[in-house]
């Protein structure tokens, strides 16, 4: 988990960990930008990562708010494992979450619950 957190912190810090630059800001921006073309059919239940998201380099990237049932901010990005592991980074909220839950049958329930609890706890 600690390596994942350091990676997420590096992404949130636009390529830096502590005082060390690992990748440039431009690389982070490129990785977290949508690279799907306009011809990709996203209006299907089989489209992963889901409505409101595009796809960057290894991440689902939220392009719109109000479309996805998942709480979050425009520009946040995430990815998940089959059995329930999950992380997301929300630059607007300066937020990183890494969850190493293992529950194939309840993974979406736990992911939604975690997101709801985290975003409800944010005080503006």
Roles of regions detected by a PLM:
Residues 1-124:
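Catalytic loop of the DD-peptidase/beta-lactamase superfamily, centered on the K-T-G motif
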């Amino acid at each position: 988990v600690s390596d994942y957190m350091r990676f997420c912190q590096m992404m949130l810090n636009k390529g830096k960990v502590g005082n060390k630059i690992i990748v440039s800001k431009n690389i982070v921006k490129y990785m977290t930008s949508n690279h799907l073309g306009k011809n990709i059919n996203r209006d299907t239940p089989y489209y992963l990562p889901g409505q409101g998201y595009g796809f960057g380099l290894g991440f689902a990237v939220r392009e719109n708010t109000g479309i996805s049932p998942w709480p979050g901010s425009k520009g946040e990005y995430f990815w998940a494992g089959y059995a329930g592991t999950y992380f997301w980074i929300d630059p607007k909220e300066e937020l990183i979450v890494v969850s190493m839950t293992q529950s194939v049958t309840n993974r979406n329930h736990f992911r939604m619950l975690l997101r709801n609890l985290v975003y409800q706890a944010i005080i503006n």
